[in-house]
Amino acid sequence: MAELFTSQQLGPHEVGDPSPLAAAVLTDGNRVLVAVIAVVALAALVLAGVLVRQVLAAGEGTDGMKKIAAAVQEGAKAYLARQLRTLGVFAVVVFFLLMLLPADDWNQRAGRSIFFLIGAAFSAATGYIGMWLAVRSNVRVAAAAREATPAPGEPEKDLTLVSHKATKIAFRTGGVVGMFTVGLGLLGACCVVLVYAADAPKVLEGFGLGAALIAMFMRVGGGIFTKAADVGADLVGKVEQGIPEDDPRNAATIADNVGDNVGDCAGMAADLFESYAVTLVAALILGKVAFGDSGLAFPLLVPAIGVLTAMIGIFAVAPRRSDRSGMSAINRGFFVSAVISLVLVAVAVFVYLPGSYADLDGVTDAAIAGKSGDPRILALVAVAIGIVLAALIQQLTGYFTETTRRPVKDIGKTSLTGPATVVLAGISLGLESAVYTALLIGLGVYGAFLLGGTSIMLALFAVALAGTGLLTTVGVIVAMDTFGPVSDNAQGIAEMSGDVEGAGAQVLTDLDAVGNTTKAITKGIAIATAVLAAAALFGSYRDAITTGAADVGEKLSGAGAPMNLMMDISQPNNLVGLIAGAAAVFLFSGLAINAVSRSAGAVVFEVRRQFRERPGIMDHTEKPEYGKVVDICTRDALRELATPGLLAVMAPIFIGFTLGVGALGAFLAGAIGAGTLMAVFLANSGGSWDNAKKLVEDGHHGGKGSEAHAATVIGDTVGDPFKDTAGPAINPLLKVMNLVALLIAPAVIKFSYGADKSIGVRVLIAVVAFVVIAVAVYVSKRRGIAMGDEDDTGARPEPADPAAVS
C-alpha cells in the first residue's frame, strides 16, 4: 500500500502531461459486444423467472403451516415497504446533491444523478425480490420435508429423496436471487456503457453510489430488525422460560422469522448487488486508462461469463445419494461454476485482447503503451487470482465456523465452564481468523498489484480485474446465502405448526445446519468482494485526483507539490486521515451493535410483559401478540438507520474538505484496513458461537436444556449483532465512503487550488459535515438514555416474577 502513497513513477496520463495518443472510445465492435453482454444479463432475468415458477409449483403443506407463512410474509412485506418509502425520500435528496458536484458537462452530470436513482432502484429491487420469494419458498421447503413423516393414509417417501427435494427447493430459491443480482448489475452497467460510451465510467459512479447506499441501509436496517428479534426471542424464550427455538408461545418468534428474510436475504442480496456494481465501476474507470478501448468492454465480459457459469452452477446443485450432506452438493455447484469460469475467461482473454500493449488502442499513458509483455497474461492471471481467492476464503471460513471442525468444537467444550468462557473463546477465534483472512485477501490484492510492474494504473486495473474474477462466482454465492434464511424459516414454520415431526424434522435440522455454514461462508466471500472493490475504487480515486490536479495546474508528487495533494503517509495530515478512517469503522460498528442492544431490550420487555400478563400463553390457552414485537423491531430499525448512514456519507466529506485529498486517500486506506479485520472478526466470531450452540443442541455436552446449552445461547446472542448486523454492514460502508470520496475529490481540489480557490467554502462544508455527524451520534446516544428514563417512570414493564419464568 505504501506505493500508492509514495509512487514517483508516473506516466504522462498521471501527471497531466499532454499525450499524442488517442483517447479511448467505444468502437463499433465493442458496442456490439456490450449489447451481446446485455442480452446475457436479460437471459439471467429470464432464467430467474423460470426458477420462480419451479419453486412456486411445490406444495405448501398444511393449513397451519400456510397460516404461519402468511404471517411471516405480511411482516416482511410491511417492513420492507416502510423502509423503501423512507429510503426513497433520501434517494431523491441525494439525486439533487449529486447535480451540484463538478462534471465535464451537464449531460454527464444529469446521467450520473439519473443512474444513481437506477442503481438505488436495482439494489432495492434485488433485495425485495429476494425477500418476496424467500417468504414463499420457506413453507414449501417445510412441506417437502414433511413428506418424510406422512400422516396416516398418505404414502411414505424415500428419506433421501425427500431431503434432496427440500434442498433443491431452497437452493433454487437462492438461484432466483442470484440471477437477479448478476442480471440487474450487468444490465445496468451495459446500459451506461451503451448510452455514454467513453464517458460511462463517470456516470457509473452515480450508479454505484445508488446501489451501495441502498444496500448499506438495507443491511443496517435489516440487521437491526432481525437481531433485535432474535436476541429478544432467545433471552426470554430459551434462557428464561426454557422453551425451544421457534416455539409458538414466544411472542418474538414471528418477528425472528421475518428478520431472517429482511436481514439475511434482502440485505445480503442488496449487498452483493452493490459489490457487483461498484467493482464494475472501478474496473471500467481504470480499464479506460489501462487498456484503452478494450478497457470499456473487457471488464463487462468477465462477469458475463460468470452469469453463464452461475446458471450451470445452480443446476449442478443436484443432491446425490453418495453426498454426505446438502453441503456436498452446494460445494459441487460452487466449484463447478468456478472452474468453468476460469476456463472460459482464459478463452475470452486470448480471443479478445491483443498480444502486446502497443496494440491496445486508446491508451493515453505512454508508459503503458510502451510496456513490454502480454496484456492477456496480466488479465488472465488477475481474474484467476479473484476466482482462486473466492475458493480459498470459502475453505478458510468453513474451517473456523463449521460444526465438524476443531475451532467450533473447542468453543462447544468451553460451554461446560459457563457463558464467560464461551464468549472469550469466540472472541479469540474471531481475532485469529481475521488475521488469516486479511492476509489471504492482502496477498490476493498484492499479487494482482505486482502484475502491473512499474505502472501504478495498470497495477490497480489488475486489482479491479481480480475483483471481477471474484464476481464470476457471485450468482452461486448469493444462492448459497439465501439458502440459509430459507432453511432456517422452514424449520421455524415446522416447529410453530407442529405438523413436521420425526424424520421430517431431522431433515429440516440438517438443512438448517447447512444453511448456517453457507451463510458464514458467503459472509467471508462478501467481505473479500468488498475489499477488492474498495481497493479498486481506491485506484479510481487516485485517477480522479490526478486528473483534478492537472486541471488546476498542480502535481501530486515531487518538488513543489502541495502537501494536501501528496499521498505520502509521512505527512501529518495524511497520518491523521489514516487514523480517522480506521476510527470511522469502529464508530460505525459500535453504533450498529448498540442499536441492536437497545431494540433487543425493548423486545425482551415486551415478551416478558406478555408472559406475565397472559399466563395462558404457556399452556397454549392464549395466543401471544406477535404483531407488537414486529412493530417494535420495525420502528427501531427504521429509526436507527440514519446515524450509521450519515456517518458513512459525511465522514469523507469532513476529512476531504478539512485536510485535503491526500488525507482523504489515507482515510480510505485506514478504513479498508480496519474494515477488513473488523468485518472478518465480527462475522467469524458470531458464526462460531452460532454453530457451537447448534453443536450442543445436537446432543453434545448435555444437549438442550443443560447449563452448557444456556452458556452457548448467551454466546450466540452476543454474536448475533456481530455476524448479522455490524459485520456485514461494513462491506457497503467501505464502498460508500470510497464512492463519496471519488465524487467529491474534484470539488475538494477545485476549492483548494486555482482560480476557484475558496477557503471559506471548504470551511463551511467541513463544519456542516461535522455538525451533521455530531448531532446524529448525539441523538443516537440520547435514545439509550431515554430508554432508561422510561423505566424510571414505569413506562417499561417491571422484570418478570422469577416464579413465572422458572
Where are the language model's segments positioned?
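Hydrophobic packing and interface segments
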Residues: 2-806
